[in-house]
Amino acid sequence: MATDVVPTAKLYEEHCASCHGAGRLGGIGPALLPENLGRLKREEAVAIIRDGRIASQMPGFRDKLSTEQITQLTGLCYAPLPQVPRWELADIRGSHVAHVKLGEKLSDKPVFKADLLNLFVVVEVGDHHATLLDGDRFVPILRFATRFALHGGPKFSPDGRYVYFGSRDGWVSKFDIYNLKYVAEIRAGINMRNIAVSSDGRYVLAGNYLPHTLVVLDASDLAPIKIIPVQDDAGKSSRVSAVYDAAPRRSFIAALKDIPEVWEIPYDAKAEPIYPGLVHDYRLGEALAAKGPFPVRRIRLDDYLDDFFFDQSYEHLIGAARNGKNGQVVSLIVGRKIADVDLPGLPHLGSGITWDYRGTPVLATPNLKEGTITVIDMKTWKTIKQIKTLGPGFFMRSHEDTPYAWADAMMSPASKDAIQVIDKRTLEPVRTLKPAPGKTAAHTEFTRDGKYALVSVWEMDGALVVYDAATLKEIKRLPMKKPSGKYNVYNKITRSSGTSH
């Protein structure tokens, strides 16, 4: 037995630790513990190590590891730690970092000149930095260090002054754009998925893979307010897939990984009471309303939702499971599934966008597994068209003031360098752009007015390439270190239909 343990540990250190953490607690990749692998069967884990995983861009190791070695590593992933790390309120409070001294007053006027609503925050994952970019002149204002492995996209305060970052290893950071400096940081978890900022600017919600919690923070200084354990009525806990702000509903939405539920968490003090059980008549006292701030409304479903998308009203969410064959449409008004949606392959709903097509609102979503973009009528929830593309893609973006939608094929080995421009009026591709032939091109974002589109060359020696959104000609190119995403202040805080929220 002893001779078995040592080589397995060395295999993990050599092939896995750089992404999944030295103690299997997560890093760029998720934590590899039995508590976090509840839905994954061992034979499926073997296949993932051998062949890779499309959705997470994890490579396969069939050429580097033998069948026996893959089996060894699988066994390690399912082996419990002597003690599962805890991250409780005292730990969160103890991690707090205040970058603004007590009594220090930050200026309410920006220390630079630019259109404050046409700024971009560009995340450069190559060396863990971010660049604040002037969206009129396409000139960097400041490049600054971030925490390790940011994930989920930065989120802005409602006025666009502050940007909040979330990292894979649990850190939440608040940065003052006006003063070009960090305000505060705190570690909300050990392995975190993403964060959301409330529409009133008062709260930040962090969703964790490890521990299985949601953490509510005060947006002003990131002080912890509440930890919400994530578990069903039977006590089964779950990782959090993602958290979102449903601004028109003044609530947070949490997608859960291991239990078939979606949670709605109101942050409005005037919200209607939430009754956990079945209530026929509240006067009879059949159920008591959940007490305290941030009550949980559980929406129970037939299947898991790993990935989902909201309509512009935030009355419906469209979700899909990674191993499912169809999507589900869930009404947040009535709290249940109201329709099934035909979504073959592996749709990436988190990158879906909407627009008006011949008088009908439509949803378009790329696919991580197939070279298709699915276009769905959002009145009937029927598929209008499957647009054939050059290969599986991750991101799709547009803007209200452009007739085009831009889609990458970054999951395709043969076409990873291509961006396809699709006419929203005809649902047909009209142009293919290759910002850097042979290098990965991904993640388009538009300027505030929709006149320019910014595309990432997603490599260590990468670049941000600016295109005229009408002529599709290159305007400018800025060298950057693997710019994974760029986020326009105005488009984000106004919840543009052409970008993710």
Predicted regions and their residues:
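Predominantly soluble domains enriched in secretory-pathway, periplasmic, or organellar proteins
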Residues: 1-6, 22, 45-51, 65, ...
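Short metal-coordination and nucleic-acid-contact micro-motifs, chiefly zinc-binding Cys/His arrays
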Residues: 12
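The −1 position to Zn-ligating cysteines in a subset of zinc-ribbon hairpins
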Residues: 15
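Extracytoplasmic electron-transfer domains, predominantly the class I c-type cytochrome c fold
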Residues: 18, 23-27, 32-82
